[in-house]
Amino acid sequence: MPLQSSLPLDGSDSPAAMAGRLALPVPDGHLDELRLPDGTLRAPWARFFSELGEQGDLGNLSPDALAARAAAVARQIRDNGVTYNVYADQGGGARAWQLELLPFLIAEEDWAVIERGAAQRATLANAIMADIYGPQTLLTRGLLPPGLVYGHPGYMRPLKGYQPPGGSFLQTMAIDLVHTDDGWTVIAHRTETPSGMGYALENRLIISGQFADAFREMRVRRLPPAFAQLISTLAHAPLVAGADEGTSLPSSGGLHIVLLSPGPFNETYFEHTFLARYLGITLVEGRDLTVRNDMVYLKTFGGLERVDVILRRLDDVFCDPLELRSDSTIGVPGLLEAMRAGNVMVSNVPGAGFLESPAIHGFLPGIARALLDERLILPAVSSWWCGEAAAQDEAMSTLTEAFVMPTYPRVPGEPRLGMERGLQPLEDWRARIAETPDRYTLQAPLPLSHTPCWEPDGRGGGRIGSRASMLRVFAIADGNGGWQVMPGGFMRLAPPRLDAVSMQLGGTSADTWVLSSQTSGAVPLAARSGLAAAPDDWLESTQVSALVPPSCIDTASSRGGASLMNPPGMTCQPPLPSAMANTRSMAAREPMRPPPRPSGSQHGVCESGSGACSV
C-alpha cells in the first residue's frame, strides 16, 4: 500500500514546509525522491513547491487546486488522442496515456553523472556492434562468449561484415536506470527500437503548461535540441557515405527520410505518428516500400520515390522476410541487400537487439576496459548468465531472491521473483535452468526509488503519494563519434501497490525536469535543425495507403497530396489517432520539410526569448 499524505489548506505555512513536514515515509529500503533521510525536502523539490506558492500557479497547493490541474492533464491527453496499446487488454488494446501531474526533478549535478554515463554506454554499445559484426576480437580475446553471440536470435548473420553509412551502427539508444542510495544503476539497454522519446516530449508539452512559471524560473533544460540532433544525424550520415564511398546516396531531388512502423496495433503507435509529424518525415509501413535494383522506394500516387534513410520501429527479425523471418508480413523484402549495397541507411541497424540481452551486463566492465580503456561511470545490476558454468553455480545459490530473466527475446510476460513463483516449485526452476542454462540470466533485485505523485480521491480532491519508479534516458549520436543525451527522459511509475514498472501492467509516466543554472534559449526545432521554414501552403495530410480504405481518401492531385475524408455515414477503419492529421502523406512530394508550424506553446514552438516555449 503506497504511503500518502494530504496537503493542508493552511496558507500560513510555506508550501515547501508543508510538503516536507506532512509527507509520510516511503517503504523501508527504498530511496525517497522527495525527502532527505532527515525528513527535509531535497533541494529541487523544495524549490519546486516554493515556486508554486510564490508564483501563484496553484495558490497554497490546496487539494482542490491540484485535483483541477490533474483533471486538466487528463483532459488534454484525451483531446490530443495520446494512447498506448496494451496487448493483454481484450477490450480493444488502445488506452489513454497515463501521465502524472507532478514532474520528476533531477538536480544539475546529478544529471551530469547520468549524462556522462549514458554517453559512455552508447559509445561502448556502438563499439561492440562494430566488433561482433566485424573482426570479432571480443570473441577471440574471451571477452564475450561465442555461445552468447551466435546463440542469440538477435544476432543477424546476414549482416556480418556490414559497414553502415557514416560508420555508426546506432543512432539512438535508451538506457533504463534505477535510483538507489548508492546512485543510479543501469538495468537495461534499449537498442533495437528504443521507444519513449516521443512520449517524453508529449509529457513535456502538457506538464510544462500546467506549471509554466515554475518551469521558467527553475530553468528547466529543453528537449528540442535532442530531436534536432536526431534529424541532423539521420540526414548527415548518408551524405557523408555518398561522398566518401562513392555510393548512390543521396537520391536526387533531396534527402528522403521515412519512419517505418509495424502499424496501428503496435503498443507505441501513437509515438510513431507523433515523431513523424514532429520531425517532418514520412510515416510508412512495410507494404508502402519496395526494393528495386537494391534501392528502396516509397510507393506514392505519383509513382516511386527513392528512400535514403529509414528510422525503423520494426523489430529486427521482421525487417526482411527474404533473409530473416519468412512469415513476416510487415517487413520490406530485399531490405538487407539494399543495406549491403550501401543504398539505404537503416537506424538502428538490424541486429542491434543483441545488446538488449540482460546476459551482457556482466561482461561490459571488461569490454569497456578493453575497447575504451575506461571504467564504467554507471554500474549495472548484478547479473549472471547461466550459460557459463561458473556463473551458473553462483547464480543458483541466489535463485530464491533473484529475478529469472530470459537471455533471449520472448513472448510477453514479466520476470518473476524466485521466491514468489507461485505454484511452480523452486526445484522445477532449477531443473529448467540446468536443462537449457543459456536461456536464463539471473539478476539481483534492486529496490526502486519512490517518486512523489498526485493521487485523486475521486471526490474533487486527492493526496500526494509515492510509487516505485524507473527512468529511461536517451542518447543520440552526433555524427562525429560523440553522443548527445536528451536532457530529461521518460520516467515511469509502477501501478499502486506494485514494484514492477511496466506500461503494459498499467503504469504511469511523469515529465522529467533537468534543472540548470543557465537560462535555456527558446528556438523552434526547424531553426535548430537547419531545416527550411515551413511554407504557407504546407500540405496537412495523412499517411494513408495501408491504414485507410480508398473510400476514405480524397486525392488532392493538384496539390500533390492526400487528405483524410470521412464520407457522411461512414467511419474509416481502423481509426487514426488525431496526431496523424498532419503527418506527411505518402503522396506528399516535398521530402525533409518540417511539419506545419502550430500555434501556442502546446506544440513546443515559440519565438526566442518570448518565454512561451514549453519544451
Predicted regions and their residues:
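N-terminal helix-forming leader/targeting segments
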Residues: 549, 574-578
